[in-house]
């Protein structure tokens, strides 16, 4: 679950990087919330989109490892990988689905900027070809 301040930070990052996609990771508490929802997000860690593209994102593997190390040192877990879709709605593309295969159990948070004045943020669990939207 993402609180309003982290949600605002996520949207700000997407707007700052436009027209290119933004990307990063979210740290979460190591256990599910009391109400059975997704674990509570406690931190946002921006990453560099090495593709520098409005159509896709790439994060250098060494940067991913540094981010995960920092998250775990703080006593948290990797909960989500986030990025933006600068021209479309926040629904996983085939590229997202393919990439998610390497990160089972990690949520995919997508900021849709098809209308930059009214961004949409959605989160998904992607398992193989199955896409399940989860509550933010």
List the model feature ranges, each with a label.
Residues 84:
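Metallo-beta-lactamase
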Residues 1-78, 87-136:
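Conserved beta-strand-loop surface patch within small alpha/beta domains used
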């Amino acid at each position: 679950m993402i609180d309003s301040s982290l949600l605002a930070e996520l949207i700000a990052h997407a707007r700052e990087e436009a027209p290119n996609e933004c990307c990063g990771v979210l740290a979460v508490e190591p256990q599910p919330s009391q109400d059975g929802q997704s674990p509570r997000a406690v931190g946002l860690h921006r990453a560099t989109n090495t593709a520098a593209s409005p159509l896709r994102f790439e994060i250098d593997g060494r940067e991913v490892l540094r981010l995960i190390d920092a998250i775990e040192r703080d006593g948290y877990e990797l909960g989500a990988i986030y990025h933006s879709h600068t021209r479309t709605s926040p629904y996983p593309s085939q590229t997202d689905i393919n990439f998610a295969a390497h990160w089972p159990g990690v949520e995919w948070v997508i900021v849709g900027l098809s209308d930059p004045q009214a961004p949409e943020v959605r989160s998904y669990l992607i398992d193989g070809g199955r896409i399940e939207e989860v509550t933010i």
